[in-house]
Amino acid sequence: VPEPIERKQVFGVTFEQGRNELVIDDKLFSNIVTENKNIPESAKIDLAIAMITLKYTQSNSVAYTCGGQAIGIGAGQQSRIHCTRLAGTKADNWYLRQSPQVMGLQFVDNIRRADRDNAIDLYIGEDYMDVLADGAWENIFKVKPAVFTTEEKKAWLATMKGVALGSDAFFPFGDNIERAHRSGVE
């Protein structure tokens, strides 16, 4: 068990802070400050998972959760919006991996899981030609896939809903909420 007070010394200066002893239970979600006071049970579970994740993540963190799992975590950035963007991009990539374009990819037999996962990451990202170029795709796919266009990605991401967002601190500006909404946070 960690000490109740954590101490770190940096260049002769001692910093100390108390251990995070936040109890994560239904009481945590009792003070709803938004206009919509209805939180479905599934959202409470996702929010609890976000808070548990954040409790054990580096300070200044944001977590997106959906369906009982963390789908994007942004930690240790210098500003809250950078955490929100980083975690949101990870959440977007999680959702893009479930698109019909990705689910329909036909991989060569006996491809290793890591190679398949890396190919998917490249396919949904900006470096898609690394896996679609002649001489490359033949080692990964049975059939050369079509490019997953920016317009197709945007259309698929627009269907992302039911995502919960947790933060270990206050969002000082609306830009965080706007960015989170683009990744399905309601």
Identify the function of each model-found stretch.
Residues 1-186:
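ATP-dependent carboxylate/acyl-activation modules
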